[in-house]
């Protein structure tokens, strides 16, 4: 029997966050959240900062981006590249798991 280790971030299902709530959750100023949206690091629903609603995916990405911004002092374009690469790695890992399951069924 093989053991498989699965890693991930647990995100509770909750109602969407407003910009100030997201700002508090990731410990960044509101202006930095706006900059994240401008660089498409996170994509809220709504047309302006006062109407933006951030879902759990935005919260997860904002937490990662905040860590890169604060801890590693990476600028927004650099964070965008890093998040894109992390998304691609996650996608490839999912495909690999699917292929491994298919291979094990044979």
Curated annotation (Swiss-Prot):
InterPro entries: CbpM. It comes from the Bacteria. Pfam families: MerR_2. Belongs to the CbpM family. Interacts with CbpA and inhibits both the DnaJ-like co-chaperone activity and the DNA binding activity of CbpA. Together with CbpA, modulates the activity of the DnaK chaperone system. Does not inhibit the co-chaperone activity of DnaJ. HAMAP family: CbpM. This is Chaperone modulatory protein CbpM. The lineage of its organism: Bacteria, Pseudomonadati, Pseudomonadota, Gammaproteobacteria, Legionellales.
């Amino acid at each position: 029997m093989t053991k498989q280790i699965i890693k991930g971030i647990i995100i509770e299902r909750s109602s969407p966050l407003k910009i100030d709530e997201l700002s508090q959750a990731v410990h960044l100023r509101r202006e930095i959240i706006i900059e994240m949206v401008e660089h498409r690091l996170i994509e809220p629903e709504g047309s302006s900062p006062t109407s933006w609603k951030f879902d759990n995916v935005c919260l997860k990405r904002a937490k990662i981006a905040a860590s890169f911004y604060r801890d590693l002092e990476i600028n927004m374009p650099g964070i965008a590249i890093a998040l894109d690469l992390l998304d691609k790695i996650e996608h490839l890992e999912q495909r690999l798991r699917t292929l491994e399951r298919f291979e094990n069924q044979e």
